[in-house]
């Protein structure tokens, strides 16, 4: 689950991190009032959406008067902001953050933390190249990114934070400031089940103070049951409606931009299915894992969710029967097709537990389903059917 910038900053502030202060505004009038309370002559209007690249997309603007703050806010609210991290539809702007102006600054730094699955540890990343996409830095100048892995038994140690501070070129009182900041960031990361934390830029102001100008936090959704205060921060308007509906039925669904819907059991098989669709010239419209213990009701709902996507021109159902029986899947497919007005070709590949029985049930159903033998055959048939 992603947090908005203002939510991420407030969380970091509660752990002692210095942040760029600001107020939320849901209208132009509220933005004008917030501008009056800003301690600086210039304010920054920031569209609050779950996506990076807002500045280049026109979602971050400087304003010098309350009238300008009102105008910019009215122009942003109610629109969809399209950035390099969103799809073509963009993300809805429902409110803005009216923040104090932190510039000019001495330098912009980057500080981030992730769960490194290879080392199974929290890993911090820091760079002197703040204010730009870290992906670009990693690609063009990877030597400018410093990494430090944290031993979960002892946590972040002061010497590790000091080492990062030295590499970032900090000096004097800035060293102790950074150690406190990084220690607080680590504490926030662990205590709130964060899986991604980014402070970009982390600015060194002209007075030498270090401050978090922006903040991005992603929470492990599997941990929300024990984080009620964090869960209450969820903004469903920023999430795909089909993904939200899928979550209600314990379905792992991720919307993509293709035209071939996929229903698969098992994350690995789902990834392989999308890969082979791409290999044969198609474009998957989604990732959907119905799970190893899929029930008939869940399969029916999965089919409905796939077909709710207007861009879907065909569906590939790829099931390997292990825990889940292929005959049950077949019955669920029939029930779903009868319940939903299916106007697109459907290719079905069943293997494993009761696969022959499942195939027989589908064949005797009288429905216009395309049977496939093997993964390659299934991919070729759905791509051909969509192109026909």
Curated annotation (Swiss-Prot):
List of residues binding ATP: 46, 53-55, 100, 103, 108
Key words, A-Z: ATP-binding, Ligase, Magnesium, Metal-binding, Nucleotide-binding, Tricarboxylic acid cycle
A Gene Ontology BP annotation from the UniProt entry: tricarboxylic acid cycle
E.C. no: 6.2.1.5
UniProt keyword annotation of Membrane present: no
InterPro entries for this protein: ATP-grasp, ATP-grasp_succ-CoA_synth-type, ATP_grasp_subdomain_1, Succ-CoA_synthase_bsu_CS, SUCC_ACL_C, Succ_CoA_ligase-like_bsu, Succinyl-CoA_synth-like
GO terms, molecular function: ATP binding; magnesium ion binding; succinate-CoA ligase (ADP-forming) activity; succinate-CoA ligase (GDP-forming) activity
Enzyme class label: ligase
Comment on bound cofactor: Binds 1 Mg(2+) ion per subunit.
Reactions catalysed: succinate + ATP + CoA = succinyl-CoA + ADP + phosphate; GTP + succinate + CoA = succinyl-CoA + GDP + phosphate
Chain residues that bind Mg(2+): 200, 214
A cellular-component GO term for this protein: cytosol
Keyword Magnesium applies: yes
Subunit structure and binding partners: Heterotetramer of two alpha and two beta subunits.
Purpose of the protein: Succinyl-CoA synthetase functions in the citric acid cycle (TCA), coupling the hydrolysis of succinyl-CoA to the synthesis of either ATP or GTP and thus represents the only step of substrate-level phosphorylation in the TCA. The beta subunit provides nucleotide specificity of the enzyme and binds the substrate succinate, while the binding sites for coenzyme A and phosphate are found in the alpha subunit.
Family: Belongs to the succinate/malate CoA ligase beta subunit family.
HAMAP family hit by this protein: Succ_CoA_beta
Name by which UniProt lists this protein: Succinate--CoA ligase [ADP-forming] subunit beta
Organism ancestry: Bacteria, Pseudomonadati, Pseudomonadota, Gammaproteobacteria, Moraxellales
Gene name of the record: sucC
């Amino acid at each position: 689950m992603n947090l908005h910038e203002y939510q991420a900053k407030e969380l970091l502030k509660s752990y002692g991190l210095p942040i760029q202060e600001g107020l939320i505004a849901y209208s132009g009038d509220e933005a004008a009032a917030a501008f009056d309370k800003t301690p600086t002559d210039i304010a920054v209007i920031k569209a609050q959406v779950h996506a990076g690249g807002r500045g280049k997309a026109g979602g971050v603007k400087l304003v010098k008067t309350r009238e300008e703050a009102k105008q910019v806010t009215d122009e942003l609210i109610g629109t969809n902001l399209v950035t390099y991290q969103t799809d073509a539809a963009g993300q809805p702007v429902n409110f803005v953050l009216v923040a104090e102006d932190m510039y000019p600054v001495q330098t912009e730094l980057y500080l981030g933390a992730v769960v490194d699955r290879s080392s199974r540890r929290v890993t911090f990343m820091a760079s002197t190249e703040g204010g730009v996409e870290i992906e670009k830095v990693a690609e063009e100048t990877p030597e400018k990114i410093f990494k430090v892995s944290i031993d979960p038994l002892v946590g972040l140690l002061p010497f590790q934070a000091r080492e990062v501070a030295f590499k970032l070129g900090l000096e004097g009182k800035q060293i102790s400031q950074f150690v406190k900041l990084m220690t607080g960031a680590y504490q926030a990361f662990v205590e709130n089940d964060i899986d991604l934390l980014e402070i970009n830029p982390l600015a060194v102001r002209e007075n030498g103070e270090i401050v978090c100008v922006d903040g991005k936090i992603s929470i492990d959704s599997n941990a929300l049951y024990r984080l009620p205060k964090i869960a209450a921060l969820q903004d469903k308007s920023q999430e795909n409606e089909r993904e939200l509906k899928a979550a209600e039925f314990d379905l792992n669904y991720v919307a993509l931009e293709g035209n071939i819907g996929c229903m698969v059991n098992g994350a690995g098989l789902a990834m392989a299915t999308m890969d082979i669709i791409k290999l044969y010239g198609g474009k998957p419209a989604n990732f959907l894992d119905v799970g190893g213990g899929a029930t008939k009701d869940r399969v029916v709902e999965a089919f409905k969710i796939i077909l709710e996507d207007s861009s879907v021109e065909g569906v590939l159902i790829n099931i390997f029967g292990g825990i889940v029986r292929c005959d049950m899947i077949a019955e669920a497919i029939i029930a779903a097709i009868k319940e939903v007005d299916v106007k697109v070709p459907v290719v079905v590949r069943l293997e494993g537990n009761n696969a022959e029985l499942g195939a027989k049930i589908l064949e005797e159903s009288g429905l216009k389903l395309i049977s496939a033998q093997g993964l390659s055959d299934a991919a070729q048939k759905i791509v051909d059917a969509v192109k026909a």
